[in-house]
């Protein structure tokens, strides 16, 4: 365990410059084509896109792209530019800007309580898990509609997740940070949902948000009356989940709740979800795998310390269950009204490189609706 403490100590000590180039890590000269980039990568991307240039990789299409090697493979450099979110239109669309602003602002009261109890410190060798998540004062809600509440919960959760993840990954290169966040976002959101009061009556909530998601995708949420012909020809919106899929989703949520994870187990599991990724595009894959192993060792020791050796296997079972949710259509379910047609990956990328406000709640938990 001593090795785990020393090996992970550097994770929370230093943070890369927020204006580093997202492609090669060199000093950024500003935001170009939608992302912070250096003059070299900006010019390379501009030239490649405007001239519609086509490149070939002489290796395995997985070349390292950093300050020293960025000129060695144009194919991999352009691929990384695109993967990191550089776009030929150069600026975020109005819809994307609106979505990001909405997520950043949130619409829940700023006094919303945290998921964690007061003065709870996590015993872990990782500095980013040793920060207390101080709850805010309990808020009095004005009985919003069910779907309004769950959309607000979704917006607050995505914002809290990105800011927590930014701290957790602060010593990794930005490209890996974005890959990890995109890869783990769905299981982390499902985990937050399972631990919220929405999970107690998920059928009602999903019926509301499914109808909203379907109408948004079919353009029926726009204002204005429809002609008689339009109303007759309008088809019933397709449900995001059919009945068997919904039952499977509900069963997974119920099973996650049945594990009754405590605050240390929950935080450790969330961190393992964030860093568990087998994408070949990761630049620091060995370092990330080492973090996962140390996290698992810390959880194992915590279970043994509490004389519950079988608990570790139960937590691993919960981990696999959460990983199995990775392909669920949560973007369509919970973010359709907030994001419109903007991909959730774009919002995650933009939030990750945007400096956080001074004070944030962690994972929100709405009060029970009686």
Swiss-Prot record:
Protein name (Swiss-Prot/TrEMBL): Nuclear hormone receptor unc-55
PANTHER family registered for this protein in UniProt: NUCLEAR HORMONE RECEPTOR (PTHR24083)
Chain intervals for the UniProt region annotation (Disordered): 216-240
Domain of life: Eukaryota
Family: Belongs to the nuclear hormone receptor family.
Pfam families: Hormone_recep (PF00104), zf-C4 (PF00105)
Cellular compartments annotated: Nucleus
Ranges of biased composition (kind: Low complexity): 216-225
Source organism of this protein record: Caenorhabditis elegans
């Amino acid at each position: 365990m001593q090795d785990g403490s020393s090996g992970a100590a550097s994770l929370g000590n230093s943070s890369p410059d927020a204006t580093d180039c997202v492609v090669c890590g060199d000093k950024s000269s500003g935001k170009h084509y939608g992302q912070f980039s250096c003059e070299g990568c900006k010019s390379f991307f501009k030239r490649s896109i405007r001239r519609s240039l086509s490149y070939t990789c002489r290796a395995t299409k997985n070349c390292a792209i950093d300050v020293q090697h960025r000129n060695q493979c144009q194919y991999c450099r352009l691929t990384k530019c695109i993967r990191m979110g550089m776009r030929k239109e150069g600026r975020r669309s109005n819809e994307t800007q609106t979505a990001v602003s909405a997520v950043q602002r949130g619409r829940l009261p700023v006094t919303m309580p945290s998921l964690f109890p007061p003065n709870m410190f996590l015993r872990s060798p990782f500095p980013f898990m040793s920060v207390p998540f101080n709850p805010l004062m309990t808020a009095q809600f004005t009985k919003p509609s069910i779907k309004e509440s769950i959309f607000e919960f979704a917006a607050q959760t995505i914002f809290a997740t990105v800011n927590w993840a930014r701290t957790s990954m602060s010593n990794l290169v930005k490209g890996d940070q974005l890959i990890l966040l995109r890869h783990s976002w769905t299981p982390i959101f499902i985990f937050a949902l399972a631990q919220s009061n929405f999970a107690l009556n998920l059928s009602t909530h999903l019926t509301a948000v499914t109808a909203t998601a379907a109408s948004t995708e079919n353009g029926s949420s726009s204002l204005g009356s429809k002609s008689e012909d339009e109303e007759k020809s309008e088809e019933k919106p397709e449900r995001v989940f059919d009945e068997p899929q919904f039952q499977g989703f509900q069963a997974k949520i119920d099973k996650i709740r049945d594990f009754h994870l405590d605050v240390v187990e929950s935080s450790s599991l969330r961190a393992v979800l964030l860093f568990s990724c087998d994408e070949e595009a990761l630049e620091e894959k060995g370092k990330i795998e080492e973090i996962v192993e140390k996290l698992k060792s810390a959880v194992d020791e915590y279970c043994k310390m509490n004389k519950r050796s079988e608990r570790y296997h139960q937590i691993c079972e919960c981990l696999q269950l959460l990983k199995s949710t990775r392909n669920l259509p949560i973007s369509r379910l919970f973010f359709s009204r907030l994001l419109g047609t903007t991909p959730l990956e774009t919002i995650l990328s933009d939030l990750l490189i945007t400096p956080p406000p001074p004070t944030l709640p962690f994972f929100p938990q709405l009060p029970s609706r009686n």
